[in-house]
């Protein structure tokens, strides 16, 4: 058969189109992980909690709801969740509500949270969650939840220890922390059954309660704000002012406990409370072996001469980087503090990408309704030679929804997601591995939730 020039060109065009279509259609789209988000059913506190779940698309990062979700969180006002034991179990901390029926809990009495609990879920291969059992902490107003790296122990930070209802200089707070201490927070420790995921209480082997029995919790200084595990040390960020609302902020100092991964025991370190020289600490994070404390108060950066990592000026917040020394003593990185970006406010969460090259700080902003221009994500490049140092990514800050509560990276290290409290959304961005930029996605990048989110986490197990 003979072809004219036009026929040949037409045939080649059809063939090329077929090849292109074939290649395009062979690009496999699959779920690379699951994104779970705790929150409330409606955009107000005090309502029943839920867990929403999404499948993360490997190619473009879009989110698709997991069949059967959302499900009840097992209580009111869920604030934290963790996965453990190979992502077979998920635990959700529900704060409960006060006598007024909302989640603004503090102290003891009518303002303290009632019916707080930890609800356990089994995680199915398709991401579905099935409720198992419910457990309870020893103190009041629980608000933080972590699991150790072995997956054998789970810890809950209670803002108020049981003895706070009747303060005394001879109570269990004083027995653990020293004479004259009348109030304290506490950590409740549970051992996780590796088969069933059931939690069992770990009692304090170091301190005997005033009634002669084993103490069922581990006291920490009053007004805790956050806590974090780093190796064999548990660090608790505490504040000076007694809070009159939630969330708890005003962190000023860090308290170390030595931690045993074989028994779950917390023992008093040789170091005492370490002041940080700040007054509005919001969070303490362990990322790639560095301890970061986020502080929501202005800092002035000066640049005497030469090249400085940050432009001189006054910034609305700061991040303090530390390494951990003997007994949990914090040692400041030689580079010193680094500022939050100038246009944002209220740093609340921090993420270091899986390659350890870039650091991102989610800023909640200061407006709870309407336009919130101070919400967004600050971005930094991490340098380790000749010494640890951070510098702003040129294209930062990056957009988010209004009032981000959490920031996570997907299991394939391609996408970053934030759950946003004030507009009840999830936002996603594509992570550029060469520049650290968080770019807009090729398709949808905002998903609407049923109500206000409080926390998010990613599961990389999809089978």
What does each of the following model-derived ranges do?
Residues 15-19:
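Classical Sec-dependent N-terminal signal peptides that target proteins to the secretory pathway
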Residues 26-463:
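Predominantly soluble domains enriched in secretory-pathway, periplasmic, or organellar proteins
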Residues 2-13:
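Bacterial N-terminal signal peptides that target proteins for export
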Residues 21-25:
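C-terminal motif of bacterial Sec signal peptides marking the signal peptidase cleavage site
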């Amino acid at each position: 058969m003979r072809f004219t020039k036009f026929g040949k060109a037409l045939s080649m065009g059809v063939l090329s189109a077929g090849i292109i279509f074939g290649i395009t259609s062979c690009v496999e789209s699959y779920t690379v992980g699951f994104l779970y988000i705790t929150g409330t059913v409606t955009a107000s506190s005090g309502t029943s909690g839920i867990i929403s779940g999404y499948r993360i698309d490997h190619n473009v990062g879009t989110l698709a709801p997991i069949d059967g979700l959302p499900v009840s969180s097992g209580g009111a006002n869920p604030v934290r969740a963790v996965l453990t034991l190979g992502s077979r179990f998920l635990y959700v901390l529900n704060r409960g509500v006060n006598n007024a029926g909302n989640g603004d809990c503090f102290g003891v009495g009518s303002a303290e949270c009632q019916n707080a609990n930890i609800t356990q879920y089994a995680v199915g291969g398709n991401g579905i969650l099935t409720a198992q059992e419910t457990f309870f902490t020893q103190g009041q107003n629980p608000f933080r939840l972590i699991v150790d790296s072995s997956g054998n122990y789970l810890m809950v930070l209670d803002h108020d220890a049981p003895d706070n209802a009747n303060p005394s200089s001879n109570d269990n707070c004083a027995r653990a922390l020293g004479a004259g201490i009348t109030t304290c927070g506490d950590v409740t420790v549970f051992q996780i059954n590796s088969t069933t995921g059931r939690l069992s209480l770990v009692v304090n082997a170091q301190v005997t309660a005033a009634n002669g029995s084993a103490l069922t919790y581990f006291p920490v200084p009053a007004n805790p704000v956050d806590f974090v595990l780093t190796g064999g040390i548990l660090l608790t960020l505490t504040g000076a002012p007694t809070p009159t609302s939630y969330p708890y902020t005003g962190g000023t100092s860090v308290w170390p406990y030595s931690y045993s991964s074989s028994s779950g025991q917390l023992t008093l370190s040789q170091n005492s409370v370490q002041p940080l020289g700040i007054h509005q600490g919001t969070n303490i994070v362990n990322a790639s072996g560095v301890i970061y404390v986020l502080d929501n108060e202005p800092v002035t950066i000066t640049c005497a001469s030469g090249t400085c990592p940050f432009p001189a000026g006054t910034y609305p917040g700061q991040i303090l980087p530390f390494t951990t020394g003997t007994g949990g003593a914090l040692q400041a990185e030689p580079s010193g503090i680094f500022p939050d970006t100038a246009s944002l406010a209220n740093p609340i969460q921090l993420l270091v990408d899986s390659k350890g090259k870039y650091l991102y700080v989610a800023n909640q902003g200061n407006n709870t309704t309407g336009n919130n221009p101070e919400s967004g994500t600050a971005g930094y490049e991490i340098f380790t030679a000749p010494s640890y140092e951070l510098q702003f990514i040129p294209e930062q800050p990056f957009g988010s929804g209004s009032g981000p509560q959490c920031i996570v990276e997907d299991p394939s290290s391609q996408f970053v997601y934030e759950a946003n409290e004030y507009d009840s959304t999830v936002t996603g961005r594509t992570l550029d591995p060469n520049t650290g930029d968080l770019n807009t996605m090729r398709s949808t990048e905002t998903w609407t939730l049923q109500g206000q989110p409080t926390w998010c986490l990613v599961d990389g197990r999809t089978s």
